[in-house]
Amino acid sequence: MFRRVRPYSTFIDKCPPPAYDTGCTYCKVPAFPPDKRLDATTHLNGTAPSMWKHVLAFSHGVATFDTMPPKINLVPGSLASEFEVLRRKMLSPQHPVTLSNAIVSGIDGGTHQKVFIYPDCIQVEFKLANLPEFIQHYLLPVQETESVFNPFASANATPHTKVERPHLFQETPIHKDLVLICGHTQRDIRCGRIAPLLLQEFERVLAHEKLDVDVGLVSHIGGHAYAGNVIYFSKHQPPVWYGRVFPEQVQGIVRETIVEGRIIKELYRGQTM
């Protein structure tokens, strides 16, 4: 199917109804515990967290989000665990970076560490021992934003500016768009129960529409009360974040946002970058 490549300049108010039933389009969403009800009233626009870059890790060693710990840095020896140790010391506070674990069929973890970086839209493979150099090369700005003078700051603080070391990394462009659904069961049951239904529906709709788009699950990304949370990573545009997505809205997202490049207002949590 032909897809338009254009800026997200067009909005539509409502998600259109599905045109066909894949077999799971009208699947009933499982009930939630009384203390885990969905927020059906808060205006979604502006609820997406702001980030400068989003790193998706595939080399975490966890097969399903049903077994992934509630905090991804609790996986011993993982990229997330090592990243947590370094982030406060090395990252720029003016350029926030989010690291998430992702599971996508057809994308393996590689022999070392494999990550996707957005909005750069690149795949990078590297050795875990080179994580500090990875942060310096990919996750720091060329020039730091001037901050307010802090008389208590250490004179020997690590500079938060880019240092290039390309020989340590295998970098390739990302060639396919990606849809990720929050499915972090042990972090919050709401996303854990909705995600399998959304994953199945996206897979069926994308196949029906003959669209070559990857789809998978991602760890906690914020706003479980707005489940299902869906992020669409386009090769050409900033990521788009939707909330309160249910199976019957998947066809509308595919048709309006992925194919036509339009944003659906009632589901829109914001652009994350």
From Swiss-Prot:
Q: Which PANTHER family match?
A: ACTIN PATCHES DISTAL PROTEIN 1 (PTHR31902), ALTERED INHERITANCE OF MITOCHONDRIA PROTEIN 32 (PTHR31902:SF7)
One Pfam family of this chain? Suc_Fer-like
Q: Which domain of life is it from?
A: Eukaryota
What organism is this sequence from?
A: Clavispora lusitaniae (strain ATCC 42720) (Yeast)
Q: Which family does this protein fall into?
A: Belongs to the AIM32 family.
Q: What is the name listed in the Swiss-Prot or TrEMBL entry for this protein?
A: Altered inheritance of mitochondria protein 32
